[in-house]
């Protein structure tokens, strides 16, 4: 006996696809997007908040992929690590943090050195300068004998040539602190790779663990180093790992990684702590005391300064509890976002959850391959739809974000048009399955690629993001077109409750978001329906 085919809800997350009415530097408006344009004209749509307090960040803080996917998947406002750590500094508990003090005590008791490694910017996506300044205060109050700072330059979540201003803040702060030295500088392209391009990680690792200088005899002024690369047309993100002073990592040293976002720090930490490590030749360093701000990867077994909160009953877990099947697909750059982050930090799939990882192109920067792997992601998605077994399919298209980060407008426009073509194919497949297609984004980026001064902008934005609901004629919500209306002032936290509403599944109490669908006078759903209970 043939099983009845499932009419899926397909959630397509267009990473970095924000909304702006401005035309200048707006790759999304400039691009030819007939599919998205038609869907916006034909189907119910609204705009959602994807930044600031509505997604668990400080007021005015731009959103990012981790936060966006966590909020979408959680159906609630989750206090993000940026806020949690900032609050601990404000209420002084940071300075009494047991693990931070233990790292300092290790360096003191063994008369070794303490190393601080992390991204040096105020971008607030992976780290924050305030956290580094607070760490220096802890080390000073504990009288750590030697403190070496290894700075990773940004240029991706900040202006592309802003590193000197951030490093100056640190340099000025430690000017009269003789025990503190800025030891190395490395662009995030090398130190924060997350796509298993181990040659990049090796370059950062080698400088951290070697006393050799790549530029000239040490010590070297950070301004001279950065100007050296600026004059070669190399921006902050791509500064090669360089030593400007003494302070390599040696046996018995303590190390604190102060990035709070895990995905781009895993590889470097892995190279330092994993035994055996087979991705490149490493030094035989022993008795290291390694502390990470957050849980980068449970297999690394490092101490944690800020352990994760337990997050239950995200969308994936809820769907699984009802015995329904679900599917996640993304290319390498965003795979963790539709799995780990979307599931609230759960590394293993839930029962009934299938996953597909599509490899991102092996290029140095994505302006060399603006299509990325969007077409293959679409093929895998359509295949999952056609199986007729999945109630919920979650897809990420990485193009708008990854190309937006390059600052290359022409290539970003090309990537936007590629995604639009893919959405056309996806729309056809969902329509044929009588499913429901939801299109949204996790944060803005590609809609703002020029600053007011006309220079390249590579960072995320605080702009609203689209939410489009496209229903098949026999989908669970009656309407097919303009008969569904949305609440105003929604946020990403309302996406999961909306999906559960369409699936006719009861929202768990942990989900504080609300369904975006209102029972307008045109609404033909059964207003007295009883949600399916667990």
Curated annotation (Swiss-Prot):
<comment type="function">
    <text>Catalyzes the interconversion of 2-phosphoglycerate and 3-phosphoglycerate.</text>
</comment>
<feature type="binding site">
    <location>
        <position position="126"/>
    </location>
    <ligand>
        <name>substrate</name>
    </ligand>
</feature>
<feature type="binding site">
    <location>
        <position position="65"/>
    </location>
    <ligand>
        <name>Mn(2+) 2</name>
    </ligand>
</feature>
<comment type="similarity">
    <text>Belongs to the BPG-independent phosphoglycerate mutase family.</text>
</comment>
<dbReference type="InterPro" id="IPR006124">
    <property type="entry name" value="Metalloenzyme"/>
</dbReference>
<keyword id="KW-0934">Plastid</keyword>
<feature type="binding site">
    <location>
        <position position="194"/>
    </location>
    <ligand>
        <name>substrate</name>
    </ligand>
</feature>
<dbReference type="Pfam" id="PF01676">
    <property type="entry name" value="Metalloenzyme"/>
</dbReference>
<dbReference type="Pfam" id="PF06415">
    <property type="entry name" value="iPGM_N"/>
</dbReference>
<feature type="binding site">
    <location>
        <begin position="156"/>
        <end position="157"/>
    </location>
    <ligand>
        <name>substrate</name>
    </ligand>
</feature>
<keyword id="KW-0324">Glycolysis</keyword>
<feature type="active site" description="Phosphoserine intermediate">
    <location>
        <position position="65"/>
    </location>
</feature>
<keyword id="KW-0464">Manganese</keyword>
<feature type="binding site">
    <location>
        <position position="443"/>
    </location>
    <ligand>
        <name>Mn(2+) 2</name>
    </ligand>
</feature>
<feature type="binding site">
    <location>
        <position position="334"/>
    </location>
    <ligand>
        <name>substrate</name>
    </ligand>
</feature>
<dbReference type="InterPro" id="IPR036646">
    <property type="entry name" value="PGAM_B_sf"/>
</dbReference>
<dbReference type="InterPro" id="IPR005995">
    <property type="entry name" value="Pgm_bpd_ind"/>
</dbReference>
<comment type="pathway">
    <text>Carbohydrate degradation; glycolysis; pyruvate from D-glyceraldehyde 3-phosphate: step 3/5.</text>
</comment>
<dbReference type="GO" id="GO:0006096">
    <property type="term" value="P:glycolytic process"/>
</dbReference>
<dbReference type="GO" id="GO:0030145">
    <property type="term" value="F:manganese ion binding"/>
</dbReference>
<feature type="binding site">
    <location>
        <position position="401"/>
    </location>
    <ligand>
        <name>Mn(2+) 1</name>
    </ligand>
</feature>
<keyword id="KW-0413">Isomerase</keyword>
<keyword id="KW-0150">Chloroplast</keyword>
<feature type="binding site">
    <location>
        <position position="405"/>
    </location>
    <ligand>
        <name>Mn(2+) 1</name>
    </ligand>
</feature>
<dbReference type="InterPro" id="IPR017850">
    <property type="entry name" value="Alkaline_phosphatase_core_sf"/>
</dbReference>
<feature type="binding site">
    <location>
        <position position="460"/>
    </location>
    <ligand>
        <name>Mn(2+) 1</name>
    </ligand>
</feature>
<feature type="binding site">
    <location>
        <position position="188"/>
    </location>
    <ligand>
        <name>substrate</name>
    </ligand>
</feature>
<feature type="binding site">
    <location>
        <begin position="261"/>
        <end position="264"/>
    </location>
    <ligand>
        <name>substrate</name>
    </ligand>
</feature>
<dbReference type="InterPro" id="IPR011258">
    <property type="entry name" value="BPG-indep_PGM_N"/>
</dbReference>
<keyword id="KW-0479">Metal-binding</keyword>
<dbReference type="GO" id="GO:0005829">
    <property type="term" value="C:cytosol"/>
</dbReference>
<dbReference type="GO" id="GO:0004619">
    <property type="term" value="F:phosphoglycerate mutase activity"/>
</dbReference>
<feature type="binding site">
    <location>
        <position position="15"/>
    </location>
    <ligand>
        <name>Mn(2+) 2</name>
    </ligand>
</feature>
<protein>
    <recommendedName>
        <fullName>2,3-bisphosphoglycerate-independent phosphoglycerate mutase</fullName>
        <ecNumber>5.4.2.12</ecNumber>
    </recommendedName>
</protein>
<dbReference type="GO" id="GO:0006007">
    <property type="term" value="P:glucose catabolic process"/>
</dbReference>
<feature type="binding site">
    <location>
        <position position="442"/>
    </location>
    <ligand>
        <name>Mn(2+) 2</name>
    </ligand>
</feature>
<dbReference type="GO" id="GO:0009507">
    <property type="term" value="C:chloroplast"/>
</dbReference>
